[in-house]
Amino acid sequence: MYPVSEAFLQAVQGNTRKYYWTGKITTAGGVEYLFDQEDIVKGSGYITAQCCGNSEIELGAVYAAEMGISLFLDIDRYTLEEAEVELSYHLRLADGTYEVVPMGIFEVSEANRTVHVLELKAYDRMLRFDRAFNGFETIGTAYGMMALCSTACGVELAQTQAEIEALPNGSELLSVYPESF
């Protein structure tokens, strides 16, 4: 979870709140397009998270987030192949200042264009873990295995080795065998 201030927690619990969204689209070529609440089609944005692709529990499933948004931006949709979208939520606190919370980085999977609107659908980097395991036998700590998987999938590991080792079984040796998959 992202750490927020006590003032943020109080503001989010209020009956009414003033907030806005901003974001940045970065193309594979490094071109950046900034957008704010004026560029977002009202009521078009969403972020949802789902664990499994169906109604059954699956071993190894992770929560993956989907983001959708419609923007009044004049961007060629074909330039958005392999682009990333960063979203930020700005909440007004009791003292009148705004606290910013990053809502994630999403990889564009669909970009559709109408005359005035660009519609984006994107997924977070957890989908990078949806790949075949190479089947070798391995023994290691939880952190070692997490670091191995994160590096192989190109995803930054959010926890430090010390944080993982502080967990109840964080320093235990674990085994993975090919026939488990």
Model-derived segments and spans:
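Charged- and aromatic-enriched interaction segments used to assemble
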Residues: N112-F181
